[in-house]
Amino acid sequence: MTKDIAERLMSCYSGAIFDALREKGITNCVLPPEIAPLDPSKKMAGEAFTVSGHLDLNMDPHETLLRWTDFLSKAPSGSVVVCQPNDHTIAHMGELSAETLHFKGVNGYVVDGGTRDSAFILNLGFPVFARYKTPRDVVGAWVPDSFGEDIKIGEVNISNGDYVFGDLDGVLIIPSSEAQSTVDRVEEVMSTENLVRKAILQGVDPREAYLSYGLF
């Protein structure tokens, strides 16, 4: 069976992916470095399911939870949820929500905002990438208001269906139209890097290794 793009990306790492995108002239693809993995050992890859929302401190708590759980119901299996909350004051992910997404087969969650219940999420093993941690939650405070629409995090535009990859070094967005050729090139780059590594460990001068293999 042929591996899909997300599965192949899980064998890659962000540095090689960026190098392949840079060769294509795509450099505005890395989310702000403040967005970091809750668990540094976790990777994630999948097609983006985009979400945006807004802070509203006058919302009825019941209504906020209805709209939040509606969002959880919409998240597709195999996707990576990418959320632009337009807010940097509360947590936009927590234990029960992570449990729900994990059970549904969602591959990870990226938010230009916060998370909470960190110990529980770490124990669950669900990949969450966020700017910060706080115990404040969405109840009576925040609601999602669009799904599957274009969003922007930092200077990076993200469309539903673009590919998302995250590891210890950060999160990259791969345009859907470039995903197949990018992962093909990443696998070539990693294979060549193995040859460079072997040469260096055999005592080859780094400049000579670069000239021989064309990368470093």
Residue ranges and their predicted role:
Residues 71-98, 102-112:
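Extracellular/luminal Protease-associated
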Residues 133-209:
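Acidic, glycine-rich flexible loop/linker segments
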Residues 97-100, 125-127, 188-189:
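Short, solvent-exposed amphipathic alpha-helical segments in soluble enzyme
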Residues 66, 94-98, 145:
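Charged helix-capping and loop-helix junction motifs
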Residues 1-63, 67, 71, 80, ...:
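Intrinsically disordered, low-complexity regions enriched in acidic/Ser/Thr/Pro/Gln residues
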Residues 102-103, 107-135:
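Ligand/cofactor pocket segment of small-molecule handling proteins
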Residues 18, 28-29, 47-50, 78-82, ...:
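Structural motif
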